[in-house]
Amino acid sequence: SCGAWEACFYDGASTRVDTRELLQALTQEDNRFRVTFGAENCGIAGNTNAALTMATGEFVALCDHDDLLAPDAVRCILEAAQDGADFVYTDEDKVSADGTHFFEPHLKPDFAPDSLRSGNYICHITAASRALMNAVGGLRPGFDGSQAHDLALRLSENATKITHIPRILYHW
């Protein structure tokens, strides 16, 4: 529902031919898909940071390989950014492998620092202004496995305006 987006992929030396072929096909079909094929797997933080360096937008959102966004997710996030948010998160749920059944909704509270310090209720989808992401240094190597929580803590500590969109816009 929004044409102003790009998807940046960093392939961390995947040995799967079908993955490489799919990524190459995406870039040929639509120039909003950008791919770099890395010579090595740099871990979750390193691979994500490599993808972040490819992004040209003023706002960036982090997604995993198995994520599905609602059709209006990008538009909703951009509207929050236009309203002054520099850190945005949404509600989420899980989706069946065939993409037909949605279950286990995670309806999150508005920003609650003490709750975030206790555990990562924010998870995905997380989006931030490029300026804020750059200010906190992106994801930190050495935090793979808890990288999303570490990033959410640092983004929230440095954000000017945090916005929770109380809609399920992210499925995994």
Label every model-predicted segment:
Residues 45, 53, 95, 101-131:
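A recurrent flexible, glycine/aromatic-enriched loop bordering the glycosyltransferase active site
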Residues 113-172:
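Conserved nucleotide-sugar donor-binding catalytic segment
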Residues 38-55:
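Glycine-rich, basic loop-to-helix element that forms the pyrophosphate-binding segment
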Residues 68, 72-102, 131, 172:
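Conserved donor NDP-sugar-binding/catalytic core segment of glycosyltransferases
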Residues 44, 63, 68-73, 94, ...:
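Hydrophobic/aromatic residue at the end of a short beta strand that borders the catalytic acidic motif
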Residues 10-14, 42, 65:
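Conserved short acidic donor-positioning loop in nucleotide-sugar-dependent glycosyltransferases
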Residues 60:
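Short aromatic/hydrophobic "clamp" motif used to bind/position activated sugar donors
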Residues 2-37:
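Acidic donor-binding segment of Leloir-type glycosyltransferases
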